[in-house]
Amino acid sequence: MKLKILVSAIVSIIIWPASITAQSELIPMIEIPAGNFYMGTLGEDENYDEAPMHKVYISKPFKMGLTEVTNAQYELFCPKHKLLRGKNGFSSEDDEAVVFVTYQDAVAFCDWLTQKEGKTYRLPTEAEWEYACKAG
């Protein structure tokens, strides 16, 4: 019998626009410059759903969290999340990436942080995330 475990994390958040100079009070940010990169793969083997490879332009710089959102950061928004720490052996420490959150939870966290700091926070698009990881 195979055991499937769904683990999702808030991989990062971004602040828009990048022209905002003040740092987040809660999330250390890094600026990602505008640029272009090849997104996806050639679609060979297990990566068939990421084909075709194509050029993507990121037209404006943006700021992204330096690390994934941590348990400690997320639990300022949702203290009950502490009950999930260490579940199935995942992410038990303050500085580890928060897991067991849904897309809706992640959006709600961004909305909460927007209200708290008065700056616009949102999740990165797939293209922004891949660019920051590969080329940015």
Model-derived features with residue positions:
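Bacterial N-terminal signal peptides
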Residues: 8-17
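C-terminal, low-complexity/hydrophilic appendages and adjacent surface loops
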Residues: 46-51
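Positively charged n-region of N-terminal signal peptides that target proteins for export
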Residues: 1-5
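Active-site microenvironments of metalloenzymes and redox enzymes
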Residues: 36-45, 56-136
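Basic phosphate/pyrophosphate-binding loop/patch that engages nucleotide-derived ligands
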Residues: 27-29
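Boundary at the C-terminal end of the N-terminal hydrophobic targeting segment
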Residues: 20-24
